């Protein structure tokens, strides 16, 4: 897979270009060269050290760029790597099937679970089909239908959050976008089954919250969670979207800050360089977290599960 490098990764690009060139020479060389192998080893070591240095000191704006990376794993990628026997369920039984939300029953280590998440799309045609991962009311009502089904059949619910926000179009507003989001918040807070929410890319405002109320809320290391995009915040406060980097720093939208404020429960480590560099390893890290948290929640009866969730929600703002 050819990677799209971000601006702050330019020093890494130069090294990896040299490494790839040497690999090509080595691959097509008729006689092995010890000097070539040694130089390749030194460059790979230098590249690794450079990656560690750059990614150990990322600013909020750089993290926001990583969260939006076009090759970052999406919900369907996690379904492929973590779950088996996925049966997708479609439609809200009222208006339409919103492709920006995918969901259905799958198995996690042999156990039936309900998986729901945003899906952005990669190629142009798929992006349009998925509405760039911005759900309309019918998408959130589909998610609600699946969550209520999961409760009836006593299946844990696992959500994957990755959206710039709920779709703000006129049609969406006419069909009750805010009502759909509000109802999801209300219902999710009272579901009698374990709910684990994972912010895996962008966690944009109510569009993220509508599938983000749970017993555990996790964030991938380079994901973001905020009430508005940095560009939107900059446009409002400074009347200048170019001040998005300053806005990102001020908003506290990165995982460590949100963990400090106790708005999320756990930060899931990503491979060096970001989740887009290794989908499989990222999925393994997410899976390990899900299994551990499900085991914790399984020990609670319905009453204690709901009380724990209630206390979690009531503690917001009191850290």
Curated annotation (Swiss-Prot):
<comment type="subunit">
    <text>Acetyl-CoA carboxylase is a heterohexamer composed of biotin carboxyl carrier protein (AccB), biotin carboxylase (AccC) and two subunits each of ACCase subunit alpha (AccA) and ACCase subunit beta (AccD).</text>
</comment>
<comment type="similarity">
    <text>Belongs to the AccA family.</text>
</comment>
<dbReference type="InterPro" id="IPR011763">
    <property type="entry name" value="COA_CT_C"/>
</dbReference>
<dbReference type="GO" id="GO:0009317">
    <property type="term" value="C:acetyl-CoA carboxylase complex"/>
</dbReference>
<keyword id="KW-0443">Lipid metabolism</keyword>
<dbReference type="GO" id="GO:0003989">
    <property type="term" value="F:acetyl-CoA carboxylase activity"/>
</dbReference>
<dbReference type="InterPro" id="IPR001095">
    <property type="entry name" value="Acetyl_CoA_COase_a_su"/>
</dbReference>
<dbReference type="GO" id="GO:0016743">
    <property type="term" value="F:carboxyl- or carbamoyltransferase activity"/>
</dbReference>
<dbReference type="Pfam" id="PF03255">
    <property type="entry name" value="ACCA"/>
</dbReference>
<dbReference type="GO" id="GO:0005524">
    <property type="term" value="F:ATP binding"/>
</dbReference>
<keyword id="KW-0963">Cytoplasm</keyword>
<keyword id="KW-0067">ATP-binding</keyword>
<comment type="pathway">
    <text>Lipid metabolism; malonyl-CoA biosynthesis; malonyl-CoA from acetyl-CoA: step 1/1.</text>
</comment>
<dbReference type="GO" id="GO:2001295">
    <property type="term" value="P:malonyl-CoA biosynthetic process"/>
</dbReference>
<comment type="function">
    <text>Component of the acetyl coenzyme A carboxylase (ACC) complex. First, biotin carboxylase catalyzes the carboxylation of biotin on its carrier protein (BCCP) and then the CO(2) group is transferred by the carboxyltransferase to acetyl-CoA to form malonyl-CoA.</text>
</comment>
<keyword id="KW-0276">Fatty acid metabolism</keyword>
<protein>
    <recommendedName>
        <fullName>Acetyl-coenzyme A carboxylase carboxyl transferase subunit alpha</fullName>
        <ecNumber>2.1.3.15</ecNumber>
    </recommendedName>
</protein>
<dbReference type="InterPro" id="IPR029045">
    <property type="entry name" value="ClpP/crotonase-like_dom_sf"/>
</dbReference>
<keyword id="KW-0547">Nucleotide-binding</keyword>
<dbReference type="GO" id="GO:0006633">
    <property type="term" value="P:fatty acid biosynthetic process"/>
</dbReference>
<keyword id="KW-0275">Fatty acid biosynthesis</keyword>
<keyword id="KW-0808">Transferase</keyword>
<keyword id="KW-0444">Lipid biosynthesis</keyword>
<feature type="domain" description="CoA carboxyltransferase C-terminal">
    <location>
        <begin position="35"/>
        <end position="296"/>
    </location>
</feature>
């Amino acid at each position: 897979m050819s990677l799209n490098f971000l601006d702050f990764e330019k020093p890494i690009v130069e090294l990896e270009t040299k490494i790839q060139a040497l690999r090509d020479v080595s691959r097509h060389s008729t006689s092995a060269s010890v000097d070539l192998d040694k130089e390749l080893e030194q460059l790979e070591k230098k590249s690794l050290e450079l990656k560690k240095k750059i990614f150990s000191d990322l600013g909020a704006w750089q993290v926001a760029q990583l969260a939006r990376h076009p090759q970052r794993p999406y919900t369907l990628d996690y379904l492929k790597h973590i779950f088996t026997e996925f049966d997708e369920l479609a439609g809200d039984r009222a208006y339409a099937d919103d492709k920006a939300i995918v969901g259905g029953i799958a198995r996690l280590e042999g156990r039936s679970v309900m998986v729901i998440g945003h899906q952005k799309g990669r190629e142009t045609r798929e992006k349009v089909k998925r509405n760039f991962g911005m759900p309309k009311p019918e998408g959130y009502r589909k998610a609600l239908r699946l969550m209520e089904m999961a409760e009836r059949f006593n299946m844990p619910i696992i959500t994957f959050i990755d959206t710039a926000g709920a779709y703000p179009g006129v049609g969406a507003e006419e069909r009750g976008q805010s009502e759909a989001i509000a109802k999801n918040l209300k219902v999710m807070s009272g579901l009698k089954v374990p709910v684990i929410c994972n912010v895996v890319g962008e966690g944009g405002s109510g569009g993220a919250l509508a599938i983000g109320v749970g017993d555990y809320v996790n964030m991938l290391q380079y994901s973001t969670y905020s009430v508005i995009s940095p560009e939107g915040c900059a446009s409002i406060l400074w009347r200048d979207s170019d001040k998005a980097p300053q806005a990102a720093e001020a908003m506290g939208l990165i995982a460590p800050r949100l963990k400090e404020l106790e708005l999320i429960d756990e930060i899931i480590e990503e491979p060096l360089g970001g989740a887009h560099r290794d989908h499989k390893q990222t999925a393994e890290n997410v899976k390990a977290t899900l299994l551990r948290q499900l085991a914790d929640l399984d020990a609670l009866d319905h009453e204690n599960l709901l009380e724990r969730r209630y206390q979690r929600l009531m503690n917001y703002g009191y850290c």
